[in-house]
Structure formats: C-alpha cells, structure tokens
A protein has these predicted regions:
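N-terminal export signals
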Residues: 2-21
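C-terminal region of N-terminal signal peptides and the immediate post-cleavage residues
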Residues: 16-35
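Beta-strand-enriched, solvent-exposed domains that form extended recognition/catalytic surfaces
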Residues: 33-161
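N-terminal active-site segment of His-dependent metallophosphoesterases
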Residues: 45-46, 50-62, 69-74, 79-82, ...
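A short C-terminal boundary segment appended to hydrolase-like catalytic domains
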Residues: 46, 443-490
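Extended active-site neighborhood of metal-dependent phosphoesterases/phosphodiesterases
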Residues: 140-144, 152-164, 241-346, 417-425, ...
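Acidic/histidine-rich helix-loop elements
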Residues: 176-208, 265, 269-276, 288, ...
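His/acidic metal-ligating clusters that form di-metal
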Residues: 215-224, 315, 321-323, 332-422, ...
C-alpha cells in the first residue's frame, strides 16, 4: 500500500538527563544530591525529592507519565536512593485552562498509585484524540519536575495522537537488546562508567525485562512477539537455552533476528562454546589474518533461532508481513548484509511490492543514525550495504516501517533515499527506559507506541538503570516523545 504521510504526537523532548556522578560518597545534606531540579516533600519515610518527570507513552486516548521520588538527604555509591511515596497524576484539556487551580473539577481526570512506591508510572485513559492536554504529577503534594528542561515535561502539555478509523486488526510487540546472561548494565569498558546491578539474590535483570515484555505483550493481546537482536549477552549455550525457555512462555508466535551479541563466537574465547555446532563462514567473510589463524567459530544461537545471514518472513493475521534481516558480522559490533541475503531480501520485497511490510534488522541503516550515535559510523550497518538496503526499500512502496535496535536509544531517522518508509531506532528492553514497542494495525495505518515494562521487579530495575552513564541514560535512551509515539499512514 502507498502511504499518505506520517503523523507524530508531541513535540521535541530529550529524555530526562540525570546529573548524578558515581563515586561521590553518601551525602549528609540535600545540596549534594544530583537530583537538583525537583520539589521537596515529606512523609513518614522522611524528606524526598519528586524528580525525573518524563512523558513515556502518548496514544490516541491515553497518557502515561513516570517520575521518581528520591531521598533528599543521602546518596549510595553516588546514586540517589528511592523513597516510597503515594503518587497522583491529573490530566485535563488545555482548552479548560492551563492553571489547575482555576480548572473546573469535572474537567480533570485523576489517577493514583496503588500504594507507596519510589518509581511511579501512571496512565490516564479516556482522552480525546488529536487534542492538547495539560498534566500534573505529584507525590503527596510535591510536584514532580523534569530533571532538566524538557519540552513536554516543562510545558506540561502533550497532544494525543489522531485516531485511525476502523477496527483494530492486530497488535504485535517488538523488543530488542535484552542481553540474557548479562550481569552489569551501563558499562563501556570494564567497570566504567560505574554499572548498575541487581541486589544479591535478585532475579537477573535481563530475565526480569524479557518476562515483563512478554507479560506486556500478553496483556495487549498481541498475536506475535519479535526480538530484534541481542537476545543474549554473548550467545553462550546456557544463555540461548534460557532465552528460548522464556520466549516459549509467550502464548502467541515469536520470531528473533540476530544481533551482534548473538553472532557465532570463537571457541577459544570461552570453553562453553565447545558444545555448540561449528560455524563455517562463507567465502570472503573473514580477513586474511582470521583465515590464517584457522579460527574455530561456534554458533550456539543458530541451533535454536535459525541460520545466520538469512532473512525470514512472518505473515501477519492482518494481511501484512514482517521481514527479519540478519545484519551481524563476525568479530565486531558493526553491521553488514551478505550479498546472498541482500539478493534474497530483494526477491522477498519485489514479490509483493505494495503489501504492507515492516522490516526489522538489528543495526540502524541511515546516515543520520551513523553520524549521531556515540559509537560512530563503524557501529551501525556499513555504508555500502546501508545504501543497497535503502534502495530496496525505495523500490518497495509497501514498506511502511524499518525498525532497528543496537544503539539502545529511541530515534526517528531521515532516510537517504526517496521513500515514505519510517526508519526508527527503538530503545533497549533491559536498560532505560526498559520496555518494548507496540504496533497496532488498522486498515489505514499503524499506531506505534513504546510501552514501559510493568511490575515491581521491573520498576526497581528501571530506577537502577535510570542512573547509569553518569545519569545520562534518559538523554541517550529515551529520545523524543514523537520518536516513541506516532501514527504511520499506510
């Protein structure tokens, strides 16, 4: 199908930037807290700051907002300490007035947390589509504030998405960067920056994240669940088996693309790889040095999730299709698409060029992604393959959406070819903001919404990963509100 255009919800808003610096000793005064942009409140637990206000999800009829309440007087290992509070979210039409004190009570929709919590994620439903709304979040009277000056959060105004006509045809959920087997989050090299960990004895956070994604997909009535790369930490046999066990708890169908962490690994890097099948790279896939070394690669991931560098097609109940692409290389984090796979992908797309199609691959493909991600262009799909891939999309008007993970961030990128397809990078399931992207299919388009992981374990982990990267995780991962919430007309 041809697309008539893209409608976005909300304006430009960076994720809430934390100013926390790890390594600072525990504080004895509020002035040393990194959460400086906040309101001070008090309850039976003591003084707290209501901070980190962030608009998470905007749909045609709902608004989801999150914030946290931190101890106003102390830090632990340079990070703020959560304080349980009662939370409240109030939402009202902007047309009723911007000052809540003068708004008619009947115009205000109000929801409360179910109990005390340090992390608050509240949703107001029953809103009108394509309408400006004001909102106010507070914990026991302390008004939650964004940590830095964000657009929607500072203005406290959002616009709901337009409503697509007709009945909902199908919902699918797409997650990425789960990293089953990983034990520390937020590091670049070694233990730097200081990582987030779960407390001793707690369930591993990648498993908490994937279980929450699966539960969220089940609650949404999703027919299918997709993991777009980096399902595992390093594709060790026990990681692959555990990931498969968790995915099999989803009541519908699931499919997985391969990410750089899921690539075949060298047997000499870890004795555990020895139990897995030998992987023979195709001709020309290895450098001369690698060939001379006679490297022994093992593909534990492929034994459960399919052959490397081959595309797959998943037929949707709504009449569309999802096409998965393997963009991994050997021995590096960058991306490539082998010529045989590129040819096969071209055949798939050309076979039904106007059929509504979502394409997913782990590595981002646009020049904008290449030159804005912290890992430099070497971190994404190589430029030659990226242009070949985009030209295939350009020749296939039915491609409505191209989804990538890998960068652990939310971003809507401009393509480098003349296409109306939307190119998205989607946030990681295991690190802030922790969740998955829900796609709802209608006759005339797709509703795209990021949904935060739910549950006490998931929220506890969200607070921990929120303060990785020296508190910059929201700026690096959340992206803009309209990169996570949009309507694609197709």
């Amino acid at each position: 199908m041809l697309r008539a255009g893209l409608i976005i919800g909300g304006g430009i808003a960076l994720g809430g930037i934390g100013a926390g610096v790890a390594g600072r000793p525990a504080a004895a005064a509020g002035s040393t807290s990194p959460v400086s942009t906040s309101s001070i409140g008090h309850n039976h637990h003591g003084r707290f700051r209501a901070a980190d206000l962030q608009v998470m999800t905007v749909t045609e009829d709902s608004l989801t907002v999150c914030w946290a309440t931190w101890d106003a007087l102390r830090l632990e290992e340079g990070r703020p300490v959560g304080v349980p509070t009662n939370g409240r979210l109030r939402v009202w039409p902007k047309s009723a007035g911007s000052d809540l004190r003068t708004v008619r009570p009947e115009a205000v929709r109000e929801v409360h947390s179910l109990g005390e919590a340090a992390f608050h994620l509240l949703t107001v439903e029953g809103l009108e589509p394509d309408t400006d709304y004001c909102f106010e979040a507070d914990s026991e009277g302390a008004r939650a504030k964004p940590t830095h000056h964000l657009i929607e959060e500072s203005r406290r105004v959002v616009r709901t998405l337009p409503r697509l006509p007709g009945e909902l045809l199908e919902t699918i959920v797409v997650a990425n960067d789960v990293h089953i087997g990983e034990t520390v989050d937020g590091v670049l090299v070694g233990e730097f920056p200081p990582p987030a960990r779960v407390p001793e004895g707690a369930r591993p956070y990648p498993e908490v994240a994937l279980a929450a994604v699966i539960e969220g997909a089940r609650r949404a009535g999703a027919s299918r669940l997709f993991v777009n790369g980096d399902l595992t930490s390093e594709a060790r046999p026990e990681e692959v088996r555990r990931a498969r066990e968790l995915l099999d708890t989803f009541p519908g169908r699931w499919r997985v693309t391969r990410g750089n962490h899921d690539r075949p690994h060298r047997a000499d890097q870890d004795a555990r790889y020895a139990e897995c099948s030998t992987y023979t790279p195709p001709e020309g896939a290895l450098s001369s040095a690698a060939r001379d070394e006679g490297r022994d690669y093992r593909d534990c991931f492929g034994e459960h999730f399919g052959e490397r560098q081959r595309p797959w097609v998943e037929e949707l109940d709504s009449g569309g299709r999802v096409v998965g692409v393997d963009s991994t290389t050997l021995d590096s984090s960058g991306g490539a698409i082998a010529s045989d796979q590129m040819d096969e992908l071209g055949d798939i797309l050309r076979s039904e060029p106007t059929r509504r199609t979502v394409v997913m691959l782990h590595h981002p493909v646009t020049n904008e992604a290449a030159f804005t991600n912290p890992g430099t262009p070497a971190f994404v799909l190589n430029r030659r393959d990226a242009m070949k891939f985009q030209r295939l999309v350009e020749q296939t008007p039915g491609v409505a959406l191209v989804m990538a993970g890998h960068t652990h961030r939310s971003r809507h990128n401009r393509p480098d070819v003349a296409t109306e397809a939307v190119f998205l990078e989607t946030p990681a399931a295991k690190s802030w903001p922790t969740g998955a992207t829900h796609l709802r299919f209608f006759d005339d388009g797709i509703m795209v919404n990021f949904r935060h992981n739910m549950g006490a374990e998931a929220h506890d982990w969200a607070m921990r990963t929120r303060w990785t990267q020296f508190g910059l995780s929201p700026a690096l991962g959340s992206g803009t509100v309209d990169s996570r919430n949009m309507v694609i007309r197709c």
